[in-house]
Amino acid sequence: MSLRCGDAARTLGPRVFGRYFCSPVRPLSSLPDKKKELLQNGPDLQDFVSGDLADRSTWDEYKGNLKRQKGERLRLPPWLKTEIPMGKNYNKLKNTLRNLNLHTVCEEARCPNIGECWGGGEYATATATIMLMGDTCTRGCRFCSVKTARNPPPLDASEPYNTAKAIAEWGLDYVVLTSVDRDDMPDGGAEHIAKTVSYLKERNPKILVECLTPDFRGDLKAIEKVALSGLDVYAHNVETVPELQSKVRDPRANFDQSLRVLKHAKKVQPDVISKTSIMLGLGENDEQVYATMKALREADVDCLTLGQYMQPTRRHLKVEEYITPEKFKYWEKVGNELGFHYTASGPLVRSSYKAGEFFLKNLVAKRKTKDL
């Protein structure tokens, strides 16, 4: 398993998922006393840092191209540059992770949200994103730099238990469980994910769990396993507008199949919060984005995130356009008008961006008490 900065979903640049933990997490009882103490004492909200975007005063002065011309590679605009998180709290967290022999994609992928998504405070919660089932995917989407293979290594049967134990001891408020695609398995790994959720809830009933799942090849029974596992948020990313699906995603994935995943999760578990994400800057137009958002809302999707596509390596799809912060604000307004309960839209937003923040946490609570 691997720990990912909140989401870091699949569009992080320059790398995507990164590697899983260098070694599996051992049961707490077998850890040395020093590591036991580290697990029991932190990190907590006060250990987390918050980061800001680069100086906004330079945005209006930027004269570079935002749309790619043939043969051109776009320069990174100032609003996609962030300050390097520093200070004693950041260093304390980093040292804690090192002492526990845990490695985060937050660092490996140089995630732009490492400060903000790890941020606590009055209106945010400490959020971590765990990647299950290894670091090798059976699919090859053109935006994603995770390594691929037809037959990845077998699953670690102890991973659900070990993951749940480590997270429960760590004291997080909100955890996102995601995974690679495992088309080599009969159920796509659904049982593995469901077990992890169940173990987590057994150890900490108050923790909020979001699952960012594969499409399980459209297998409804696999979707049901995860939807009925006790999770709070069921997330599955459509990634882009329908017109660009074949260009962007693996041939085994498509918009209609992803929409069926989200619909079926709500059908079998009406109280679950459903969530999806769209990358912008791949060549889509405004009409296509609006139609996609409308279709998602008509499918009763509750939460939507929109973020800037960032090219992971030169082998992957080029960025066709850098979307301005003002345009992202516009799409957030559109999302609210369409009736999404939560719309996060911004250049650095990723699919699990600030997943446990105040609003979404309270949305889960309201849904549980039937107020919404």
Swiss-Prot record:
Belongs to the radical SAM superfamily. Lipoyl synthase family. It catalyses: [[Fe-S] cluster scaffold protein carrying a second [4Fe-4S](2+) cluster] + N(6)-octanoyl-L-lysyl-[protein] + 2 oxidized [2Fe-2S]-[ferredoxin] + 2 S-adenosyl-L-methionine + 4 H(+) = [[Fe-S] cluster scaffold protein] + N(6)-[(R)-dihydrolipoyl]-L-lysyl-[protein] + 4 Fe(3+) + 2 hydrogen sulfide + 2 5'-deoxyadenosine + 2 L-methionine + 2 reduced [2Fe-2S]-[ferredoxin]. It is found in: Mitochondrion. [4Fe-4S] cluster 2 binds at residues 137, 141, 144. Binds 2 [4Fe-4S] clusters per subunit. One cluster is coordinated with 3 cysteines and an exchangeable S-adenosyl-L-methionine. InterPro entries: Aldolase_TIM, Elp3/MiaA/NifB-like_rSAM, LIAS_N, Lipoyl_synth, rSAM. Residues 1-27 form a transit peptide. Its cofactor is [4Fe-4S] cluster. Its main location: mitochondrion. Pathway: Protein modification; protein lipoylation via endogenous pathway; protein N(6)-(lipoyl)lysine from octanoyl-[acyl-carrier-protein]: step 2/2. Keywords: 4Fe-4S, Disease variant, Iron, Iron-sulfur, Metal-binding, Mitochondrion, S-adenosyl-L-methionine, Transferase, Transit peptide. One of its GO terms (cellular component) is mitochondrion. Gene3D superfamilies: Aldolase class I (3.20.20.70). This is Lipoyl synthase, mitochondrial. It is an enzyme of class 2 (transferase). Transmembrane segments: none annotated. Residues 122-341 form the Radical SAM core domain. One of its GO terms (biological process) is neural tube closure.
